[in-house]
């Protein structure tokens, strides 16, 4: 006989346990290294022994601590500490000769733990939210802006309502309120908008200082191959170009003697490849792709009707509409804030207004009316993919202790996102120019887009690739589309490539390409890093061929002719730490105590069939709630793909 109990009643029986476990204790067994350059920076780290369990493969988790005043050399006042989390994984093969890769999710304000745990990291979390299994397609990653994920400025205790997303600070000495299934407490970064990155350019400065400390002073990294590659996703379409270009600008200043920083900031970072996965790169170029993806895509899904589609186009192109608003933003910013630092309130307001209008009138008719998923047009909402089991795992006491972290993990931080939005970071100019700058300086750019994503869709990615104005623009435009040969029987997508620039459309993949098509994503990543053509992995792309030309693909000029069938629907389940996976009725059942929950999963016929070992048998058991694993943010990773090392920088949880 199966017994049931309301969630609230179940949780009351473990209130004592919750009171002991809700706030992480002070980390123990942490190695502390003071900077040899006397800058006041520190590295603290542990060997966690989590996630990457391949014999002989080491991993390290910790923080780079930057003191107040670190960013003064860029003219930025910073009166708070920046504590950036990283998780470094050695390559599974030949780590001494492996290049290093940094992985970052976007947001802005989203944790890179999402990518690590559901896309390309060394492990996946099981449905019990307490154990992991190896990912055979790992890229072996980093976390960005301060206050994201496990990065922080200063710490404070908060309450959080998962349903309303209301977050309230607990003052010192204030009694700890009782928790239930949707009301949690935890320790997080300060949530002070003045102590995080205000825009992508600010974040680049903080990450560069992190890199100067880590690459020169972290004792676990001793490569013979000093190449560094950056892979990023979503808002990473801005992070990637801006961060990588900023790093290269600093490299050039160091080399030519125009950088006047202190001794510990003279390290040249040898940049090799920038990979952007379903990135929103340039708003002006990519906005036309939203009406097309909603109405005329390769899956034959008309997510909006002809009238709504026409309205989206009208909002984009009419006088005073989206396009005009972005052009106005850019003309003002180029004169009054050319570095995109958010220093001019008029520019900030105009650019923020442009983003708000374009989002509401050009993009959001799909999200409001279609009933389909924002990250996968092939799925109806709510969608449980990728599974959010990692959210609870990262706040398990044994995981927190192993990582040596003093706070609870959060998926995204609305304060960081608000700081970026407040200066109108989205529609500002410069992203495509950054990509052109990288290509002109010999740094490879690989654009990879799943063809079912709406959020940063492949039509917009293709337009961005064609909008890069550099020496070989015409040769890239002249290249045709070739199939991406993954093995003897499978074509994973289509690619246009000339030399160091490639644009790949990946079949049957949503926003998080490695989650949907892990082998295809890994092959593309591996080929890009090792100077092989994306189409076959057999041709060298680094050397000139006949008549001084680089390798280029040949085939049709357009990929739209390659059509797809809509996918079957995922079997739905609700994970209460990610309420976007739940229906309104399921959320109500949690609130009123009628839901039965095991391991943060609502028990119903679907979840019982999907996860019988977790929810399908035995008595319902109370689920101890972790300290608030939901929306705050994390930054960065370093991973390994057979031949690359990965650094996860939760630290671009850059607090600025």
Swiss-Prot record:
Entry binding sites for substrate: 456, 512
InterPro entries on file: AB_hydrolase_fold (IPR029058), Peptidase_S10 (IPR001563), Ser_caboxypep_ser_AS (IPR018202)
Disulfide bonds: 51-123, 322-358, 329-351
Signal peptide span: 1-21
Lipid-modified residues, GPI-anchor amidated glycine kind: 627
Primary enzyme class: hydrolase
Topology of this chain in the membrane: Lipid-anchor; GPI-anchor
One Pfam family recorded for the sequence: Peptidase_S10
GO biological process: proteolysis
Keyword flag Membrane: yes
Propeptide, chain numbering: 628-656
Record keywords, A-Z: Carboxypeptidase, Cell membrane, Disulfide bond, Glycoprotein, GPI-anchor, Hydrolase, Lipoprotein, Membrane, Protease, Signal, Virulence
Family designation: Belongs to the peptidase S10 family.
Function according to Swiss-Prot or TrEMBL: Extracellular serine carboxypeptidase that contributes to pathogenicity.
Name of the molecule in the record: Carboxypeptidase S1 homolog B
Source organism of the structure: Arthroderma benhamiae (strain ATCC MYA-4681 / CBS 112371) (Trichophyton mentagrophytes)
Encoding gene (name): SCPB
């Amino acid at each position: 006989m199966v017994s049931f109990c309301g969630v609230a009643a179940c949780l009351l029986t473990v209130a004592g346990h919750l009171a002991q476990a809700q706030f992480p204790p002070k980390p123990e067994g942490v190695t502390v290294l003071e900077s040899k350059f006397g800058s006041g920076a520190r590295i603290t780290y542990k060997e966690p022994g989590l996630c990457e369990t391949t014999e002989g493969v080491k991993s390290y988790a910790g923080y780079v601590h930057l003191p107040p005043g670190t960013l003064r050399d860029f003219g930025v006042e910073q009166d708070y500490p920046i504590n950036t989390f990283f998780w470094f994984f050695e390559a599974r093969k030949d780590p001494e000769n492996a290049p290093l890769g940094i992985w970052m999710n976007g947001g802005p304000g989203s944790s890179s733990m999402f990518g690590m745990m559901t896309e390309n990291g060394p492990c996946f979390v099981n449905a019990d939210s307490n154990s992991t299994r190896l990912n055979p397609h790992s890229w072996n990653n980093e976390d960005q802006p301060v206050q994201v994920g496990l990065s922080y400025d200063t710490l404070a205790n908060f309450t959080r309502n998962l349903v309303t997303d209301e977050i309230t600070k607990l003052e010192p000495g204030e009694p700890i309120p009782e928790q239930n299934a949707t009301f949690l407490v935890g320790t997080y970064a300060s949530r002070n908008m003045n102590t995080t990155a205000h825009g992508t350019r600010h974040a680049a400065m903080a990450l560069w200082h992190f890199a100067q400390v880590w690459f020169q002073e972290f004792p676990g990294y001793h490569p013979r191959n000093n190449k560094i590659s950056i892979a990023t996703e979503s808002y990473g379409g801005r992070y990637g170009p801006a961060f990588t270009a900023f790093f290269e600008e600093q490299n050039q200043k160091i080399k030519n003697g125009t950088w006047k920083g202190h001794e510990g900031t003279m390290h040249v970072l040898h940049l090799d490849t920038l990979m952007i996965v379903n990135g929103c790169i340039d708003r002006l170029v990519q906005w036309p792709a939203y009406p097309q993806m909603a109405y005329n895509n390769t899956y034959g899904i008309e997510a909006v009707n002809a009238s709504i589609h026409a309205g989206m186009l009208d909002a984009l192109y009419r006088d005073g509409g989206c396009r005009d608003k972005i052009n106005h933003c850019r003309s003002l910013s180029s004169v009054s804030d050319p570095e995109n630092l958010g220093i001019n309130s008029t520019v900030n307001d105009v650019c923020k207004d442009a983003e708000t209008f374009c989002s509401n009138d050009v993009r959001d008719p799909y999200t409001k009316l279609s009933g389909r998923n924002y990250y996968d047009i092939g799925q109806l909402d709510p969608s449980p993919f990728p599974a959010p089991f990692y959210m609870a795992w990262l706040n398990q006491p044994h995981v927190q202790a192993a990582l040596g972290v003093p706070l609870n993990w959060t998926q995204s931080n609305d304060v960081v996102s608000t700081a970026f939005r407040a200066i109108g970071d989205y529609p500002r100019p410069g992203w495509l120019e950054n990509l052109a700058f990288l290509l002109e300086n010999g740094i490879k750019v690989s654009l990879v887009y799943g063809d079912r994503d709406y959020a940063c869709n492949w039509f917009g990615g293709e337009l961005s690739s064609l909008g890069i104005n550099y020496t070989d623009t015409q040769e890239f435009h002249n290249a045709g589309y070739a199939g991406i040969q993954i093995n003897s029987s499978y074509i994973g997508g289509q690619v246009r490539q000339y030399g160091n620039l490639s644009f790949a459309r990946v079949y049957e993949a949503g926003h998080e390409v490695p989650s949907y098509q892990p082998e295809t994503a890994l092959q593309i990543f591996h080929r890009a890093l090792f100077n092989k053509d994306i189409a076959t992995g057999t041709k060298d792309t680094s050397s000139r061929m006949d008549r001084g030309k680089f390798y280029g693909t040949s085939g049709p000029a357009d990929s739209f002719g390659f059509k797809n069938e809509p996918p079957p629907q995922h079997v739905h389940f609700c994970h209460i730490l990610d309420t976007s996976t739940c229906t309104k009725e399921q959320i109500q059942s949690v609130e009123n105590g009628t839901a039965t929950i095991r391991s943060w999963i609502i028990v119903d016929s679907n979840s019982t069939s999907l996860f019988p070992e977790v929810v399908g048998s035995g008595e319902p058991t109370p689920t101890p709630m972790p300290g608030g694993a939901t929306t705050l943010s994390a930054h960065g990773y370093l991973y390994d793909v057979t031949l690359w090392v990965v650094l996860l920088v939760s630290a671009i949880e850059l607090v600025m």
